Every structure is written in structure tokens, then in C-alpha cells.
Amino acid sequence: MARLQAAAVVEAIPRDWFEEYVRALLDRAEDLRTDEEGRIQGDEELADVALVEGDHLTAGARYQRHTDPPEGEDGNGTTSELLITSWERTREVSAAVTTWHPDDQKTTWTVKLSDPGAPGSLVAGGEHHAAKRLHRLSWAARLDIRQWWRQVEGGGGQAPVTVLLRHHYGQARLLVRAAAEGGGKWRLGLTLVVRGRGWVRPLAAVGLLFVRSKLEAELREAVAEIAENWNADIPELLKHDPRDAGIWVSDLRRDREELDRWLAENG
């Protein structure tokens, strides 16, 4: 087992701005409409998404999107399906996403936002399914939003962010703690615990002794790069009204598809 540490100071997001931003994101989704064939109307980047089952933005609503690769025969692309499992603005919004890739690979995601009006927590998880065990992955992440605000307002307690990545031969667990830094900034403390699993565990324990310093240096470099990008983007974002700013549904979908594609290409 190796325990790696990193830290960063990042621009803070005001709580009221964030909560209004989330409400605006959900409002925008609800403003979208479907035509007679189920195609999404109101956002050109979602024009290739169709409602194939159920009523728009209600539990059981099922949406699909089909793509073909830049080269290759038609029908050799991916199919993505989003299933709304809950849409109750006063309690919970949740969905499940499945993407079928060529070569019999599949990526599944679940996401759940509790108390959307004043967000309480965001939980996400998923799996990448592949024929070879070596290429299978699963992950789970939780952001306890209320605990985050408590920590940046001077409280203690458990880490508000936890991420678990699991492979047949190893796993990594990330914990993120937050504190107010002053001057409109947050100080983040990150702990990454890496270990082997199964018969690999004793071998990994020995190997990690030799590469721990290198892994920690790479972690700190990655965290510094992410913090630098965050600190460049967030001040610009905060100049806007939260109902006009931001990352909307199409941007979130594009980010998830890029990650799914990376998993498939490396699976």
C-alpha cells in the first residue's frame, strides 16, 4: 500500500452562486422540448438525441443517441442511452447512462443529486465492461456538498469528497478535504491510497515501496495542473450571472462521452 499526499489552493465558488447555478442547469433541461419524433428541441447540440420511451424528464424516460466513427462502416459506432430514474426537484434527480462500444465493450454510469434546490450530495458510479478481465474497471465517487460547505466555513469532520477506482488487480482511493484559505480561496488536501488486490497485493506492496516517490511527484504535478486550470477558468465564470453561465447539458454529455471513448480505446 502507498499513501500519497498533495495540496492545492484554488479559487472559491460562493455557495449561493453554486446553488443558483445548479437550479439553472435543471431549469434549462426542463425547458427543452421534443418534436413528434421524440427529437430534442431547444439545443442544437442535442438535436441528435431522441426520446424513445416514456415522458420527457420523468422517471422511466429513455433517450438514445447513435454515432458513427469518422471512418469505417455505418453502424460501427456507439449507442448511448440515458434512463431517467428520478426527477423530483424537491427530493432527488438521478439517471443511468449506458454506452455500447464496438468490440462488445460497454460503459455504464449512474448519477444522483439529492435535494436539488439546495444540493445535499452528488453520487456517481460506473463500470467499464470488456471481454478481458484486465480491461475491466469500476468506480464510485461521492461529493457531500453540505459537508464541503461546513469545512470551508471552518468546520471539521470527514472528507467531503471520496473517489474509489477498482481494477481486478488493484484499487485506488482518493480523499479530498477542504478549508478556507482567505482571500476568496480554498485550500484542498488530497490523500490517495493505492494498493494491490488478490494475489497481486503482496507483489504490489513491494513494488510500491520503490515507486512511491515517483507516484507522489506525478500526483502533485497533476493536481497543480488541474488547480492552475481551475484558477484560470473560475474567475471568468463567476463574472456571469449563474443562470447565464456555464456548462450546460450538452457540455456535460460531451465530457462524459470523451471519457467513455478513452475507456473503450484503452480497453
Locations of regions flagged by a protein language model:
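Hydrophobic ligand-binding cavity/cleft-lining segments
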Residues: 1-131
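Actinobacteria-biased recognition of intrinsically disordered, low-complexity terminal regions
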Residues: 1-7, 252-267
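Alpha-helical structural elements
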Residues: 12, 58, 104, 134, ...
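Broad hydrophobic/π-residue packing in well-ordered secondary structure
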Residues: 19, 31, 35, 95, ...
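Beta-strand/loop substructures that line and gate deep hydrophobic ligand-binding cavities in soluble
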Residues: 97-216
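Long alpha-helical, hydrophobic tracts
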Residues: 183, 194, 234-244, 264-267
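A conserved amphipathic terminal alpha-helix motif
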Residues: 204-260
